[in-house]
């Protein structure tokens, strides 16, 4: 809700999702994402009310109302998507596609960076809820994963001109991204890390 309010998209319904992974306890890693989980942007608390529906039910209802038309975008652990599939398996063939920041596949040397605290061979979103990721990966839904292979690669880094354009912009989303870049730079990483860490 904080980010949606920031970009003026309060028309998008948001339900409270799962507070923990499907099976295990939630790991803590405040270093990766900052004290607020958003690169220390510290956005104001939202004033837009959440949907009274749980995120799982919002997913189910949206897919059922629009069969074959909904692309789910997962920027975190896949717990809510997996639970929606478990609760209402009939939605699985109705989902057009899932695009996820998820996993790493060994496609280049950057795929094996130490990006998850003390677990160097794991990507955070899968590390948090591997059981949910397994359900989604094995569901048969068309799945496009942007893993560490893609998101933490110098080829996707921002140029000096890109950063200058962000600095010159008054748009709140540009300021948000610029703070995220400062956050990762202060930790000794390049701007490309914002595509997966923030």
Q: Each predicted region: which residue ranges?
A:
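N-terminal acidic, glycine/proline-rich low-complexity segments
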Residues: 1-198
């Amino acid at each position: 809700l904080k980010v949606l309010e920031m970009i003026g998209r309060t028309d998008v319904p948001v339900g409270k999702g799962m507070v923990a992974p499907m099976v295990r306890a939630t790991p803590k890693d405040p270093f990766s994402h900052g004290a607020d989980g958003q690169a220390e942007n510290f956005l104001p608390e939202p004033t837009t009310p959440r949907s009274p529906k749980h995120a799982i039910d919002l997913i189910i209802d949206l897919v059922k109302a629009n069969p074959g038309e909904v692309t789910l975008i997962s920027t975190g652990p896949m717990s809510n998507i997996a639970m929606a599939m478990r609760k209402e398996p009939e939605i699985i063939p109705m989902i057009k596609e899932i695009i996820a920041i998820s996993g790493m596949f060994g496609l280049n040397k950057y795929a094996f960076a130490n990006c998850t605290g003390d677990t160097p061979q794991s990507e955070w979103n899968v590390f948090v809820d591997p059981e949910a990721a397994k359900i989604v990966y094995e569901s048969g839904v068309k799945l496009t994963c942007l893993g560490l292979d893609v998101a933490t690669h110098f080829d996707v880094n921002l140029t000096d001109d890109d950063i200058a354009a962000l600095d010159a912009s008054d748009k709140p989303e540009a300021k948000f991204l610029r703070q995220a870049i400062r956050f990762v730079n202060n930790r000794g990483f390049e701007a490309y890390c914002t595509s997966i860490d923030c």
